[in-house]
Swiss-Prot record:
GO terms for cellular component: photosystem II reaction center; plasma membrane-derived thylakoid membrane. The chain crosses the membrane at residues 3-23. Keywords: Membrane, Photosynthesis, Photosystem II, Thylakoid, Transmembrane, Transmembrane helix. This is Photosystem II reaction center protein T. It comes from Synechococcus elongatus (strain ATCC 33912 / PCC 7942 / FACHB-805) (Anacystis nidulans R2). The keyword Membrane applies. It comes from the Bacteria.
């Protein structure tokens, strides 16, 4: 079960970094 916790934390960290970059720079995704 601990592996699921590490994967969840890793995914959350990637999500935070992705949204930080997406909102910091002009949106270029989907254009």
């Amino acid at each position: 079960m601990e592996s699921l916790v590490y994967i969840f934390v890793f995914v959350v960290a990637l999500g935070v970094l992705f949204f930080a970059i997406a909102f910091r720079e002009p949106p270029r995704i989907g254009k």
